[in-house]
Amino acid sequence: GVNALNAYISKGHVPNDYVEYAKKDGEGIVRPDLLLTLAELFNEVTEDLEKMGLVILKDENGEYVTRGWRNVKINGENIKPLLADAVSSLENVKVFNQVNITDLKLGIRDGKKAVVGAVGFGVRKKEIYDIDADAVIIATGGAAGLYRPNNPGFSRHKMWYSPFNTGAGFAMGLRAGAEMTTFENRFVALRCKDTIAPTGTIAQGVGAKQVNANGEIYEQKYGITTPQRIYGTVEENRQGKGPCYLKTSGITDKQEDELYKAYLNMAPSQTLKWIEEGRGPKAKDVEIEGTEPYIVGGHTASGYWVDTHRQSTVSGLFAAGDVAGGAPQKYVTGALAEGKIAGESALDYVKKVGVIQEMSAQEWMQEYQRHFEKSHSMMTWEDVEEAMQKVMDEYAGGIAMGYRYNEARLEVAREKIKNLQAQVENLFAKDMFDLLHIYEVRERLLVCEVLIEHLFARKETRWHIFGENADYPEKDQAFDGYINSKIVDGKVEIVFRDLVGGHYEHTN
């Protein structure tokens, strides 16, 4: 669950205030048109959530209790069941559970290429799904599991971003010819060490400052934007001044009790750790660390290049949430707002378009079957995934390298990822669950391939940690623009686009 809605326009503020905040945090590489259309809907979707049954904390005057000017406090441990119930109650919506969608179907519509459906397979049963659609909305989230995570072995999925978000939405869009943006702005979360629990609740809830092992407050030294907070922590550790902490020692009993409750709602392992150690945050500062990098549009603007209506560069294909690029700092309400925009735009689209000439799903069915017909391969999907994460960690700016990368290392990463992609073709699946894992690795490897080209292309360090280029350690105004990508004839092609000022529509 979550304990706050982090995107809300409180009294005394207007949507454009949020645009400016996100623009500053993203060092200018954002889409103001997308941000504004989201911010205009934040409060509306917040009220929708409350009507669904979400408990939003209120003061004695019946006003929402805010945490800063853009956050609203909630009791959000049940937010996902509430949303799932809302979807399942709709008469005209059919939900297919335990189905893995792998590819988009392409056809010709009104004389140009268009997405006309999707294909996938059942995870439990040997079933192929061939779905026709007048329009498709991708809302699959971003990509986790590209880099070696903080914790090894059994605990490797104790991570910030859901391990089930494999980048599949990015991958199927790329294969369909859709343009992506800003993958080079990776997201690294500042978290409580080992539990990977959120730190914002402590920093904002009790005003805890970031301190090094000597007790020195260092956050003002490096800056307080999202990447700067992590950059400071990495630098202090690199200089031998770690471990680093959030200074909670000395907080009141009431504040400690509130932290126990808050973490039980969203990250129980943190509260359990305090109890197990016999010392809570009042007695001991909370150690912090950065996670491995993720590709997540809701935080760092990486994802599909969309117009103001959230349509991608391929006709009939829309994107919303973490998979959609251009608009960082979305959080829950931003994702819901974007879903609303994409849904309404898709409805308008299907009313206007003409006859479809579509392609068969037969080729994908044959591809699924091929993995069952392979002889037992020398590598398993798990071997390939582990090798991929090691490559990205060591050669594409992971935790091991302090998030830094250079062109020489990226060259190695490019070659090794290509070799691993070839290995995936030969993987053997013993059942449908195995096939699912093979496809998850396939999606991640394609996202890695595209990410590496983005890291090559931005020859500057615009965002510390998120894009820490050791060859080009300074910000360069020559890169005041978007770095986009698409796949042309099987190869990643980089596209440089100028910054968008007002309303944007696709023209090429």
Give each language-model segment a name.
Residues 21-43, 69-70:
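Dinucleotide-binding Rossmann-like beta1-alpha1 core, especially the glycine-rich loop
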Residues 351-432:
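Long, amphipathic alpha-helical stalk/connector segments used for oligomerization, subunit docking
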Residues 1-21, 200-202:
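Conserved N-terminal glycine-rich FAD pyrophosphate-binding loop of Rossmann-like flavoproteins
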Residues 125-135, 313:
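Core beta-strand elements of the Rossmann-like FAD/NAD(P) dinucleotide-binding domain
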Residues 138-197, 332-345:
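Glycine-rich loop(s) and the adjacent beta-strand/alpha-helix scaffold that form part
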Residues 312-372:
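Catalytic phosphate/nucleotide-handling subdomain of diverse soluble enzymes
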Residues 133-135, 139-140, 320-321, 454:
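Short, well-ordered coil/turn residues at beta-beta hairpins
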